[in-house]
């Protein structure tokens, strides 16, 4: 079975502009494989092809790509989900971030927005526990669906609001994490966290397009978390 690819290529050291390059690969009839497996095989043929990868298990978030127009992880996306009769599999870097080379993007702006929400527990220490900050099961359960984010950036780079305001809008990944700490019973800085997001851009640039929900490889729902943050901000200002 012949597999045909059209892959984004750009090496700033030698290229004046990006280009799409065609590749072919012979797939084993009756057997599927992940896109990352195909990319590794293509790199064996063309060592100049650049992309990120690490765990190959959908855990590290390194290999986020745009595949046939939709963001996802190459390591858990089967080729069978991308093949269409008479069409090439089109692979591009995650949109909205500067391209370093080929499919490798500069994640600096994504991480900068994530750091703004202070993604760690803040506790004033006024009531220090004897051993640790305990949580009831129902308190811990509230964090499910919030802490599992692997920072692959698939959500933020599929969001038009992040494309338009990458230095002002925190983005789906950052806001999902922000809500996780806002409702954590061990965190005492809810008010200061909300104050840091009370401007017109940080949260309210989300227009509930829900691209982030559509592409999240972990099945998380940043839009819902952002909606809760909006409600908290509105209640705070009332």
UniProtKB/Swiss-Prot annotation:
Part of an enzyme complex containing four subunits: a flavoprotein, an iron-sulfur, cytochrome b-556, and a hydrophobic anchor protein. GO terms for molecular function: 2 iron, 2 sulfur cluster binding; 3 iron, 4 sulfur cluster binding; 4 iron, 4 sulfur cluster binding; electron transfer activity; metal ion binding; succinate dehydrogenase (quinone) activity. [3Fe-4S] cluster binds at residues 159, 206, 212. A ubiquinone binds at residue 164. This is Succinate dehydrogenase iron-sulfur subunit. One of its GO terms (biological process) is tricarboxylic acid cycle. Two distinct, membrane-bound, FAD-containing enzymes are responsible for the catalysis of fumarate and succinate interconversion; the fumarate reductase is used in anaerobic growth, and the succinate dehydrogenase is used in aerobic growth. It holds the Pfam family Fer2_3. [4Fe-4S] cluster binds at residues 149, 152, 155, 216. [2Fe-2S] cluster binds at residues 55, 60, 75. It catalyses: a quinone + succinate = fumarate + a quinol. Its cofactor is [2Fe-2S] cluster; [3Fe-4S] cluster; [4Fe-4S] cluster. Residues 1-97 form the 2Fe-2S ferredoxin-type domain. Residues 139-169 form the 4Fe-4S ferredoxin-type domain. Pathway: Carbohydrate metabolism; tricarboxylic acid cycle; fumarate from succinate (bacterial route): step 1/1. Its EC number is 1.3.5.1. Binds 1 [2Fe-2S] cluster. InterPro entries: 2Fe-2S_ferredoxin-like_sf, 2Fe-2S_ferredoxin-type, 4Fe4S_Fe-S-bd, 4Fe4S_Fe_S_CS, Beta-grasp_dom_sf, Helical_ferredxn, SDH/FRD_Iron-Sulfur, Succ_DH/fum_Rdtase_Fe-S. Keywords: 2Fe-2S, 3Fe-4S, 4Fe-4S, Electron transport, Iron, Iron-sulfur, Metal-binding, Oxidoreductase, Transport, Tricarboxylic acid cycle.
């Amino acid at each position: 079975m012949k597999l045909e690819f059209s892959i984004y290529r750009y090496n700033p050291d030698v290229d004046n502009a990006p280009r799409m390059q065609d590749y072919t690969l012979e797939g084993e009839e009756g057997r599927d494989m992940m896109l990352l497996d195909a990319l590794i095989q293509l790199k064996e043929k063309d060592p100049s092809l650049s992309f990120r990868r690490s765990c190959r298990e959908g855990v590290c978030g390194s290999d986020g790509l745009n595949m046939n127009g939709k963001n996802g992880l190459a390591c858990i996306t089967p080729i069978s989900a991308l093949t269409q009769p008479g069409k090439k599999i089109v692979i591009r870097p995650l949109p909205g971030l500067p391209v370093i080379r080929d499919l490798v993007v500069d994640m600096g702006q994504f991480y900068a927005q994530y750091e703004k929400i202070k993604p760690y527990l803040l506790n004033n220490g006024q009531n220090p526990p004897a051993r640790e900050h305990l949580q009831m099961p129902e308190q811990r359960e509230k964090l499910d669906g919030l802490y599992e984010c692997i920072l692959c950036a698939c959500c933020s780079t599929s969001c038009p609001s992040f494309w338009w305001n990458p230095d002002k809008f925190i983005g789906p990944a950052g806001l999902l994490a922000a809500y996780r700490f806002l409702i954590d019973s061990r965190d005492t800085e809810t008010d200061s966290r909300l104050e840091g997001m009370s401007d017109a851009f940080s949260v309210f640039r989300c227009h509930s397009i829900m691209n982030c929900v559509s592409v999240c490889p972990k099945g998380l729902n940043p839009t819902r978390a952002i909606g809760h943050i909006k409600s908290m901000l509105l209640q705070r200002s009332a």
